[in-house]
Amino acid sequence: MPLLPSPLGSLSAAATAAPRRAAAAAGLSPLLLRRRAPIAGALLFLSLGAFAGVRSLSSSASARMESTSTTVPSIVVYVTVPNKEAGKRLAGSIISEKLAACVNIVPGIESVYWWEGKVQTDAEELLIIKTRESLLDALTEHVKANHEYDVPEVIALPIKGGNLKYLEWLKNSTRES
């Protein structure tokens, strides 16, 4: 059997023998393996090989962000809500209070979680909130005071870099801590 092309470069026969044996044991045809190998190789490259490059891009963007005084440390915050009306109401109050520059409302998510001793499943909507890191505590308190849930989700992730003009707009559209 000829070696399969891979985005990672040439592979030795030994390197491809184990996957071929596993595919044969699983009842997969060589044709199916040939079709899937480039996809698997690309996924492997993206998840492992490109990771270092992405990290360096992120680091350089972060360095650019820190080198200018026109931006502030920023975050993305996830908050789930039970329905569209609750999402619009909460998003509007967050923006009115200048606790965030933008809130995206993502409809149609399904959440599976542990609550009151059993697995629960609910249709929800997701708010994706872009704001200053320094406003997280005030935003969290606002969500807790204005949310229908006993324990609302408020999860913050750092923004490591991005479009500097957007990050400047984020800063200028939110209140100072």
From Swiss-Prot:
Record GO cellular component, one term: chloroplast
GO molecular function terms attached to this record: copper ion binding
InterPro entries noted in UniProt: Ion_tolerance_CutA (IPR004323), N-reg_PII-like_a/b (IPR011322), N-reg_PII/ATP_PRibTrfase_C (IPR015867)
Main location: plastid
Compartments (UniProt record): Plastid, Chloroplast
Keywords in alphabetical order: Chloroplast, Plastid, Transit peptide
Keyword Lipoprotein: no
Gene Ontology terms: biological process: protein homotrimerization; response to metal ion
Transit peptide: 1-60
Classification via PANTHER family: DIVALENT CATION TOLERANCE CUTA-RELATED, PROTEIN CUTA 1, CHLOROPLASTIC
Assembly and binders: Homotrimer.
Membership in a protein family: Belongs to the CutA family.
Name of this protein: Protein CutA 1, chloroplastic
Species of the source: Oryza sativa subsp. japonica (Rice)
Gene name for this UniProt entry: CUTA1
